[in-house]
Amino acid sequence: MAAAVAMRGSSSDGGGYDKVSGMDSGKYVRYTPEQVEALERVYADCPKPTSSRRQQLLRECPILANIEPKQIKVWFQNRRCRDKQRKESSRLQAVNRKLTAMNKLLMEENERLQKQVSQLVHENAHMRQQLQNTPLANDTSCESNVTTPQNPLRDASNPSGLLSIAEETLTEFLSKATGTAIDWVQMPGMKPGPDSVGIVAISHGCRGVAARACGLVNLEPTKVVEILKDRPSWFRDCRNLEVFTMIPAGNGGTVELVYTQLYAPTTLVPARDFWTLRYTTTMEDGSLVVCERSLSGSGGGPSAASAQQYVRAEMLPSGYLVRPCEGGGSIVHIVDHLDLEAWSVPEVLRPLYESSRVVAQKMTTAALRHIRQIAQETSGEVVYALGRQPAVLRTFSQRLSRGFNDAISGFNDDGWSIMGGDGVEDVVIACNSTKKIRSNSNAGIAFGAPGGIICAKASMLLQSVPPAVLVRFLREHRSEWADYNIDAYLASTLKTSACSLPGLRPMRFSGSQIIIPLAHTVENEEILEVVRLEGQPLTHDEALLSRDIHLLQLCTGIDEKSVGSSFQLVFAPIDDFPDETPLISSGFRVIPLDMKTDGASSGRTLDLASSLEVGSATAQASGDASADDCNLRSVLTIAFQFPYELHLQDSVAAMARQYVRSIVSAVQRVSMAISPSQTGLNAGQRIISGFPEAATLARWVCQSYHYHLGVELLSQSDGDAEQLLKMLWHYQDAILCCSFKEKPVFTFANKAGLDMLETSLVALQDLTLDRIFDEPGKEALFSNIPKLMEQGHVYLPSGVCMSGMGRHVSFDQAVAWKVLAEDSNVHCLAFCFVNWSFV
């Protein structure tokens, strides 16, 4: 670049010839390469220098001496503008490439649908002709049956036979991925678009269950194929994938014999395995294809003894078609077509094996989401806190999930064996004496005596319980079901050289849990976080020791928009974050059984305050929004793991059985509370038992606000009590009521208040007033208590408070006032937080 051009800034005299610099102030100024280089160096350090910095630049660089300060200012303005335009242009080009690729996908899908329509029209005409000429049609059908040749069985015992099967598999797979071999229908809730995971369809009326997805990812085809072939890295239900034989094929391809094991989703069904042929090849247009199908016979794979706990399932031609995209990236087509042998499971659980939607959610879209996640991490779009690398955090998620799946399935070849029970078979106790919880690098604190892991697990059917709501409640209100002493026992096994039974050193849980987010997937279907449980010492000596417990926790399907086939809360105690940290996973899994209602309930809020939708609103909610929820069935699986030493095996087993039974009872209580059939005004009145009806409380709150402040809280305060309650419930600012006692406890909150506190009406009474304010907030509140008691209300300045989940919440202003009952006595205190938001 010989010279750079910048517009000279206009001067007060309107321009003219500058005798000092010899430049025309009304025209462009040409900078020499040396001047541009000097300016670029400054721009790299400071894109927007101040006036003093520009003056300093002129003094320090003699080469810029003939340039006026205004010209320097204009140069930096233009340079920033060019930078911004370049970035915007690059962004728009990327969006355009993505839209072009998506348009290509949609055009191909439209072409496929047109072919399908033509085929259906032809079949319709043929059927009409058959109906008109029934005898002739019957004769033709018989002739067709006689003359149609059958495809001969291929010999899978030699390479040539395998290559022949591979070519057939390729043809059948492509006819499903881009053709009309299967009648595909768009999966409900999955709309294509630039920001969607892709175009997702499920089969209609074919053998087995099938799903197809296609989308755009910003990775090269070879990288995409490498990721997708590593099925255990993205398919959480995949226990193991082993390649037994690899045969080279033409065009640089390979034919592999693969044995795959899947975990059982619950303790009530056996696991599945596959013995398949996998063919990888390159097409003439440069596309990469990986297709796979089952080989006939059940004797393939490892020895029969190791496969006793599995049911052999069949994979019909499936796979991945990855095409290079202009401008970079890939267009990916994924097809999963399975026959999961639904006959082998109890009838109530067969929807898990007969639903194409389950396959789409657990396998097909999971694969597409995973490669999108990798693409965003590779491009630097994903940045996590604490300086952790995305791959490291993803590994922690995989290990948590894998440990939980191992506990549920309890495979013999992993060392698990069933222990004798106590006569009641509601909880299964399994023992693993070969499983080690400490790595070799931590051998200094290994068990002093032989031991292992005991797993207590149970499964139960739930009726009318929205899975996402249940898992969110279990996550946010651990004190409702967990025993802090058990958590302390599990955490102590990571630190000490011996395991002591809980109760020998009892601890008290403060009720406070702080959730620290670590990572989440692209669409928030998985969240990895650290949970800190705050312990309270029982003696003065223990006050000097930290009793906090840290858990690494993985949440699946808790997002409001989740439409997944599995909802999980899995956690393990941790002491540190080295890669070799042992993770003893425990937790909950809820799987919907009625797939026709997938996603219908996940949008319900955690609070039970829909009970405040009184009168006709309640009837409408029970008749419409909750109709599907009331009929929703799901299976809940609970699995908890406990390290033990050999001499304490029976004691730990008894403790584990009793603990899981107590958790089952707690979950049943919670399920009754959050069931749509239990909501309504009566449920709300039960929750705030001992207090006036919700409608009466709403009237007292509004009347007291007007009495103390002289203005109305609501725009229409002259309606009946039920109308006031509805308006207060939907009021835009957070309204909270707490008891008028020495230690105020929250007793009521409107919808905004529950959202701000990140809690539910069930657990609201677990929160005290002092827990939501930080130190400045407490000082402001306590200093105004006398004023509040004297004049009945007080304004609090803007500040920060804490939600029940430990998140900071800012607010512009808060108002506190005394709520007076009918007898003019103080019933409670009310707070209104104006313009609150999470920090």
From Swiss-Prot:
The record ties this protein, via InterPro entries, to: HD, HD-Zip_III, Homeodomain-like_sf, MEKHLA, START-like_dom_sf, START_lipid-bd_dom
Q: Which residue ranges does the record annotate as region Disordered?
A: 1-24, 132-157
> Which GO terms of the cellular component aspect does the record hold?
nucleus
UniProt domain START: residue ranges: 155-383
Can you tell me which residues the record assigns to a coiled coil?
91-134
Highest taxon in the source lineage: Eukaryota
Report the PROSITE patterns cross-referenced here: HOMEOBOX_2, START
Identification of the protein by name: Homeobox-leucine zipper protein HOX10
Q: Which organism is it from?
A: Oryza sativa subsp. indica (Rice)
Organism lineage string: Eukaryota, Viridiplantae, Streptophyta, Embryophyta, Tracheophyta
What gene name is given for the protein in this entry?
A: HOX10
